Structure formats: structure tokens, C-alpha cells
Amino acid sequence: MNRFWNTKKFSLTNADGLCATLNEISQNDEVLVVQPSVLPVLNSLLTFQDLTQSTPVRKITLLDDQLSDDLPSALGSVPQMDLIFLIDVRTSLRLPPQLLDAAQKHNLSSLHIIYCRWKPSFQNTLEDTEQWQKDGFDLNSKKTHFPNVIESQLKELSNEYTLYPWDLLPFPQIDENVLLTHSLYNMENVNMYYPNLRSLQSATESILVDDMVNSLQSLIFETNSIITNVVSIGNLSKRCSHLLKKRIDEHQTENDLFIKGTLYGERTNCGLEMDLIILERNTDPITPLLTQLTYAGILDDLYEFNSGIKIKEKDMNFNYKEDKIWNDLKFLNFGSIGPQLNKLAKELQTQYDTRHKAESVHEIKEFVDSLGSLQQRQAFLKNHTTLSSDVLKVVETEEYGSFNKILELELEILMGNTLNNDIEDIILELQYQYEVDQKKILRLICLLSLCKNSLREKDYEYLRTFMIDSWGIEKCFQLESLAELGFFTSKTGKTDLHITTSKSTRLQKEYRYISQWFNTVPIEDEHAADKITNENDDFSEATFAYSGVVPLTMRLVQMLYDRSILFHNYSSQQPFILSREPRVSQTEDLIEQLYGDSHAIEESIWVPGTITKKINASIKSNNRRSIDGSNGTFHAAEDIALVVFLGGVTMGEIAIMKHLQKILGKKGINKRFIIIADGLINGTRIMNSIS
């Protein structure tokens, strides 16, 4: 079992796989036609120079509506160029219409199509190969290996085609402990968790779960890992864990079973642990509607990161492996960015000043050797100084919508201390006095509805009438979709919704009760997000990512290991205070209060039962140590905990989970949280998808 996940290698594995496939297809020069949704991911893995040096690719063009017009010029300049299509249909389950159109219009004699799929396990591939041989298939024919749902669409063409899989692993783009599968949105930019059409939700959820299971399975087999403890929160999360367990069991070999029995047998126990925690977005629909206050979060709210972790309107590359300044600043509260940039500028100036002290040839050589890295660091520092200044200008302008007033209103809604009439007056003020964008107004109204566990009938009708009168009758369709998804409901509508969507996990309590039980709005740290701190200062509570609020998602994960919050705020009758393994015992009543279903949370153990007697030892006696191979130093051994988000994760939640890891570490629970999510989410994306 591997407990050291080198996630940085996943990027290299993906890049090498694509290059090998492109070299396999042809030795002629190639034109790579890339589906637009795939391009940002491709750019994260390879530069154009890397691609042209390692493969026969000489040109790249987009698989868009202009392709049919651009093809003659792309192919005509160089003789004998092969056309290679790169597509991803894992969520849409259909070929891009532009590919079919180009093939028919230009009568392409042979189609070479590379399609994305999650990397299968070696065992699975071996078993499939043996079965194909038994069934008499030609192993050199790629056509028989392709999913039927896509192959049937290709058969409509008279063109010959050859299909090549690009086996992928989720890879780090934001942080080495954050892996995004980019399956939350399909190629039409439909949100698979919150589809605009309610009738599609069952189908899109199934696709989303299947894709996440495939990605998790690829990671588990690639790293040779064994999952020991699993906790699922939410009905969709339980579906995901059940399906993953089934597929892992189906593809286990006798060798796998022998290894697991040796490590976790009746008489022996290796003590290694790997947790899997799965949460779906509806377990906490409130956090994405809040304004984010970390550097990365506020950039996502203002400019929106794409799947290549680049933002609109700004020509910047946020590469955490190259840009150390971005890596240091991304999860800090924005209020501390200025002092940090000032500190980094002084350190850089000090390093430049060492050239005046260089006297010997050796000292001069050392400075010259470091000059390249200093200049690169200076460029990064300049970029982030300019960007943070731009952000500051935007949030300080009234045209943006009174940034501080929105933060204050969010906190008032969460604390439940303000009457609905007062909140409605503030919303009207934001609309007419500050001319706030309607998506932000709608986000605040949805936040109010969720925190009140739906609105009184008269408040609902008042706000609904206000929005229709202000924004037009066509807004009715979006409000209907928001109601069906539980974002904007009346007390009566909430009851009807609960009857028709009994399988969905939804909050059933007003947020003021939730905040009391989980202490999500700590009074002592109410204004912590406004404090100016440096990188050595830690917030005692995780209120730095949002305005005085701790996300419910963090508290749900925290209670699995640390019951101190529930002990002080919900019930003093807790089975433990600290636990190395995630445990849900005696949370059933709390979960039923939250979601109306005590079975919305589920715990399971995927190794022999004796492990619970061995692993659940006192935290104080947990003196496990591991060695860092890079420098030979020892440090506390960390158990890997895979935290999976179905339906998207916010930049703020990522920062909060890293904070929780530190909190648990100080208490002797050494975990390495690796976040795996199907995509990034925030209030703007939700409002855009439900339109």
C-alpha cells in the first residue's frame, strides 16, 4: 500500500500519454483539432513548444463553428498533414457536432480521434485483453474497445475512423493536494449537479457519479492504495461510495486480496490508514452563495477561473509549481495580501543588494547564477501587485455594488438577527441606489431563502414580484428552476418540493440553529476576516475565507475526527473527543435534524473488521514517524484522507480544508487532506447555470 501520493507525477503521466498517442498515430506532420473545453486542460499540461518538440503536431486549431472554414488553409500549407481530433465526451455523451459537420463537408477520408477517458487499472486492462482473446476479437482493432454510445454516432458517417484513448488521471492545478476532474460542466456548459431542466437531473447526477467513481478508481489503482475508512454524507455521496466499492471489488485480483489480507489480517495490522470522505453540494448549499475573501476566492468571484486555472480579462498564468508567490498568497485572506507583497518586495530587494557585497569571483558567480530566478520572482511579484491593486479598485467602487454592504448583509442573514422587512429594504437599496448586478441580488435572495428554510408566503411573493417587475417577466423561468432546486422557496413550496424530491439531500432547518450546533458564526471571531495578518498568524477559527463564517462543509468533516465543537455546542454526550479514524457514531440525531434523514450519513470499513480494534488507539500514543526522501529528515507520519466534493468546491472551502488539516495536526491527528472535486463553484456560476 502506498501512503505517499506524489500528485505532481500525475501531470507528467497525462502529458506523456498524449505525446505517445500522437507519435503512435502518424509520423507525418499533424494538425491537432482540439475541443474548446479540452484546450485549457491541455495548456495546463503542455506548452505548444513542448508539443511540437515531442510530437509530429505542427498546428493547433479549435473544434468550433469556424473549423469548416479554417480547415482548407490549415491543411493546404503543408503537404501530407494528418488531421487529429482531440475530444472529451465523458459528460456530454455525444460527439461535438462540429466534428461531424467537418467530416461530412470536407469528406475527410480517414478520421483520427483521440478521446479522453480515466486511466483504467492494469488489472482491468489485462482482464479485458484476456476476454477479447477468448471472444476472438482482433486486439489491433481499436474500434471494438470504444464505448458503444459514441461509436454508434461515428457509424452514421461514411468516413473511416480510428479511435485512440487518452488515459488521464486527475492532476493538480491549484495546489498539489487539490485534484479537479472538470466534469461538473459539460461541453455545452450545463451544470451536471444543478441542470437548468429539472427533468434532466436524474440523468446528469448519474453521469456525474459515474465519472467521479471512474476518476477515483484510476487514482486508487495508479497509487496502489487501499481505502480503509469511508464516510458518505448525502444520498448522492452514498451512491458514489457504493458504486466505487463495487467496482474495486470486481477488479480485485488474488494478489490484491493477498496483500490486503496480509496488511489487515486477523493476526496482523500494518496500522496504515486511508480515509475517503464524500460530500455532495446540497449538504451545504449556503457556502457557495457567500462572498469569498481569500486571494484565490476573490479572483474567482471577480474574474472566474477556467479549467486551465486562468482568469478572464487577465493574461496571467497561475502555476503553483512555478509561481511561488501565488502559492504563498492564494489561500490567505485578501486583507493580508498587501503586507505580504510588501514583505516579499523587501526580501527581493535585499537579495539584489547582495551584489554590492560580492567581492570574490565565487561570490560574483553565485549572484549571477541566482539572477535568473530573482528576475522571474520579480516578474511574479509585479504581476500579483498589479492584480491585487486591480482587485482593490474594483471592490472599492460603488459600481461593483458596495462590497462591504453585501458582506454585512450576508452576515446579518446568516446570524438571523435582522427582520425580513429590514433585509428586503437593504436588497432594494442595493438594487436601486448601488445598482448592484442582478445576479448578486438574486444570490442574496437565495441565501435568505436557504437560511430561513424557505420564506413566509408574503415575503416570497413580495421578492418574487420585485424581481419580475425589475428584471422582466422572463425571470419567471429562472425563479421556477431555482424553486425546483430548493434555492428560492416559500413555506408551502418547500413542503411540495420535499414530497416530490424525497431522494434529494436538503437542509431542513433554519441556519440559526445550524450555526449554534456547529458554531459556524463564532462570536469572538466575528470580525476576524478584517484583520491584517502575516503568514505566521493563524486564525483560531476558520473565518478568514468568508466574512466571519465557518463553512458547514468544514464542520461536517471536522466532527468525524474532532467532536469538541459538538461537545460544547450541541451535546456533551459524545463517544469521543478525538479520533484518528473518521467516525459518525451518535451523529444520527444531528444529521436527522439537519437533513430530515438520519441515514443521510453513512460509515463503512473496507478492510477486515479487526482494524477498528487496532487503529483506534489513543491519539497521545500516536508517535508514528516518516522520513522525507528528499532531505532525509523525519516528520510526523500523515494518513491520507481523500475529501471528495460532488457538485463543486469553492476556493474558500479549499483554503478552509487546509486550515482544518493544521488544526487537527496540532491535536495529534496527522492527516493529509487531498481534495478531489468535479469542478469549481461559486454563487455566480450557480446563478448562470440556473437560468
Swiss-Prot record:
Question: Single GO molecular-function term?
Answer: ATP binding
SUPFAM superfamilies from the UniProt entry: Sec1/munc18-like (SM) proteins
Give the modified residues of type Phosphoserine.
Answer: 626
**InterPro entries, A to Z:** Sec-1-like_dom3a, Sec1-like, Sec1-like_dom2, Sec1-like_sf, VPS33_dom3b
Could you name the Gene Ontology cellular component terms for this entry? CORVET complex; cytosol; early endosome membrane; fungal-type vacuole; fungal-type vacuole membrane; HOPS complex
Record carries keyword Protein transport: yes
Keywords of this entry: Phosphoprotein, Protein transport, Transport, Vacuole
Instruction: Give one GO biological process term.
Output: vacuole fusion, non-autophagic
Its subcellular locations are:
Vacuole
Subunit structure of this chain's protein: Component of the HOPS complex which is composed of PEP5, VPS16, PEP3, VPS33, VPS39 and VPS41. HOPS associates with phosphoinositides and the PX domain of VAM7. Interacts with IVY1 and VAM7.
Function statement: Essential for vacuolar biogenesis, maturation and function. Involved in the sorting of vacuolar proteins from the Golgi apparatus and their targeting to the vacuole. Acts as a component of the HOPS complex that acts during the docking stage of vacuole fusion. HOPS is an effector for the vacuolar Rab GTPase YPT7 and is required for vacuolar SNARE complex assembly. It remains bound to SNARE complexes after vacuole fusion.
Write out the similarity annotation: Belongs to the STXBP/unc-18/SEC1 family.
Q: What else is known?
A: Present with 830 molecules/cell in log phase SD medium.
Q: What is this protein called?
A: Vacuolar protein sorting-associated protein 33
List the top taxonomic levels of the source: Eukaryota, Fungi, Dikarya, Ascomycota, Saccharomycotina
